[in-house]
UniProtKB/Swiss-Prot annotation:
Protein name: DNA mismatch repair protein MutS
Keyword Isomerase: no
UniProt KW keywords: ATP-binding, DNA damage, DNA repair, DNA-binding, Nucleotide-binding
NCBIfam families cross-referenced by the UniProt entry: mutS1, PRK05399.1
GO molecular function annotation: ATP binding; ATP-dependent DNA damage sensor activity; damaged DNA binding; mismatched DNA binding
SMART domains in alphabetical order: MUTSac, MUTSd
Transmembrane domains' residue ranges: none
Protein's organism: Geobacillus thermodenitrificans (strain NG80-2)
Record-level GO BP terms: mismatch repair
Binding site for ATP: G607, P608, N609, M610, A611, G612, K613, S614
Family as reported in the entry's similarity comment: Belongs to the DNA mismatch repair MutS family.
Assigned GO CC terms: cytosol
Ranges in coiled-coil conformation: none
Function: This protein is involved in the repair of mismatches in DNA. It is possible that it carries out the mismatch recognition step. This protein has a weak ATPase activity.
Amino acid sequence: MMPSYTPMIQQYLHIKAQYPDAFLFFRLGDFYEMFFDDAIKAAQELEITLTSRDGGGDERVPMCGVPYHSAQGYIEQLVEKGYKVAICEQVEDPKTAKGVVRREVVQLVTPGTLMEGKGLTEKENHYLATLTPFADSTYGLAYADLSTGEVRLTLLSSWEETGNELHAIGAREIVISSDSAEEWVRELKERYGAAISYEDETWLRDEWSSVAGHVTQEKLRVTVARLLHYLVRTQKRQLDHLQPAELYQVDQYMKMDRHSKLHLELVETVRSKGRKGSLLWLLDETVTAMGGRLLKQWLDRPLIDQRAIERRLDFVETLKTSYFERHELRDRLRDVYDIERLVGRIAYGNANARDLVQLKKSLSQVPSLRQTVSGLPLAEVDELVGRLDPCEELVDLLERAIQEQPPLSIKEGNIIKDGYDERLDRYRDASRNGKAWIAELEAKEREVTGIKSLKVGYNRVFGYYIEVTKPNLPLIPEGRYERKQTLANAERFITAELKEKEALILEAEEKSVELEYELFVAIREQVKEYIPRLQTLAKAIAELDVLQALATVSDERRYVRPQFSTERVLAIEGGRHPVVEKVLGAQTYVPNDCYMNREREMLLITGPNMAGKSTYMRQVALTAIMAQIGCFVPAERAVLPIFDQVFTRIGAADDLSAGQSTFMVEMLEARRAITHATQNSLILFDEIGRGTSTYDGMALAQAMIEYIHDHIGAKTLFSTHYHELTALESSLERLCNVHARAVEENGKVVFLHQIADGPADRSYGIHVAELAGLPISLIERARDILAKLEQSSGNGSLEQGIGEEAGRENGSLMEAASQQQSELELTVGSAADRVVEQSVERQAEHRASAGNEASFEQLSMFPDLAPAPVEPHLSSKEKKALAALKEVNLLEMTPLEALNKLYELQKLLK
């Protein structure tokens, strides 16, 4: 049987039942209260006191609460943790209510619908997305930033493409149909880290024509309708600031999957997941929040339309050379507030008087911006100037109406300027005259009584009063005052005349405050009429800010304007990695050239670790991306094709949460490139195949090189430690060898960080191990082994060379390992042969026809054994390390496991 709760608790339970997945902030006087399970959970999450109250049932009801004036911070905390908060307000005056005060939920705050507070990052969008899958495996995606009013809409051809878009926008909340499969819901939560919500209404209302009236395709109409229904249902108001939905296709921009963006560190670094150290960090010379958000959007979606790119470059070049005008623009833009989000607050009815002052100050900069831009020597400035709308009438309204330094609250008065409204002026005169009368009264009473310390004061409990200290009480004429309050050291009195004047003053002040609030709300409604113009202005200012930012960084870092080739030529002279150069300094960084054309489509890069291969590959990709967003590039000269896609496989990071090893991740990322790349794409593959055995890895690497060369024709930079692959240059006509240079000086290796034509002759792996701090005796032993191997390689007896170095005493271990290697080769052979059978046959034919005797034989790790030389004297620690090293089975180790083993050995020797 249900407990007999009080009417107020029954009201709470009735409303809570409508929002079971949200915390219900239930307004009671000056507090938002929570009850039952909400109270218990909120007390834990917000670290506030859990108490209880009598709710009419058998047991006391758990309760906690927060003051209404500080509730926003608590709401943000819950939303940041992925919760929703339903805000339930009193919607009638408690003084006139009969029974329980009527209450309604006025807004449902969700992770994707934050409008203000610390949960919004200044230079990042805060997107809510809706996703609709269709039977033909296409997906409708609509997303909006409620704080700015932006709405975007697209149709995607595959789940992979959809995933890339979801990662690019970083949606905080994804809205889907309630009948979605549980497995799909779980994947959305885990892979994209977004809160999941549900909405089933997918019909477009007539009043949404300004947002979606131009959307004609049914799939897109269904998708955007789901978004709008969810927004209206949760926000419970008209969303007048939502802009017309921008329809786009991903094919209109350079495509990069999330892995490529992460490998290239476009907006965040691999290690810290932070902005510092990324390309965005380098380029962000914007001085407005709007410009910062737009720059990230440009970087996420580089252009592929050459005319659009050249228009941006023209503007950047003009600003780059117009030094004084650019600095004038930067100074003016610094005084522009976030107009986009100010407009959102105005539309929501959340804007206070300080917001309107910020809007006025921002608009006051527009005439100067127009004048400066108009003076630039560029024909295209007229279009931008036309969008820089100064909204003079609005500035005049705000200048006449709003105080320069108004209070934060809009219900405490002192917002509206004198002279704006006659009624308000009359109330203010009455209040001011009354206060002048009070001052005169105080002076008169001091003179009559002779009490110099007598004063007239005020508090909200007793109103106005006359205060006299106790030593002066005998000086008061009999019957002059009426005693009101006794204090420790004084008495307070009133008079009939004082109370009469008090009533007039307080009435004037009360009516003045009420009228100011009404006037402010009316002014805010007038400002709403300017929302479309303000949004157009905000976009123009954001674009101007991004262009000046690109011009600033291009000027300060000595970048050059890229040229574009229709002949698929890539010619970079003196190219630099923009971020590495900034970190190291221009004097330290070593620039490199890169040349590719139709006859030179692939560069096979060899050379030692730490020599700069990966940096070289990344700088080529970053140069292309910077060029296609309309920025100058870090080089002495750059001619580039326009790339439709960029694919990368750089670095190794196990996806443990998905149960994927380094090698599986490597193969999946390689598959994306091989499946989707075109001859207009750019592919960067760094040491493909290192996550598996040597033969497997080399076979796959060679097969991939041949496949890209023969079937795709994309510009490709392929680095490898399989030096045997360099012989492919003779059989693949569009492949060229290049290498990262290194030299030895006095037995030490020096990495020159220069890329030169031809294959590398050595890997210098032992030198890298020495730099890592491995024991000297171990390093010397490795050098001896290497010398024997190189000598044996020259005599055609590699196995014998390794055997001589291994020694008799390890015979049993090595024989067992040799047997294991033989068995492994049988297993690998059948699999690898299937992968590369045709490629190997084709290569053999090429070699036969060319008379090429180059051998592709890989060094055997476990050859026949021979007598060992005399062992050098080793310490006990070194013997333990050597014994541990001999037990290592390299064939079954990933690179990460090998690195961990080296670390263990290093610790053992310390």
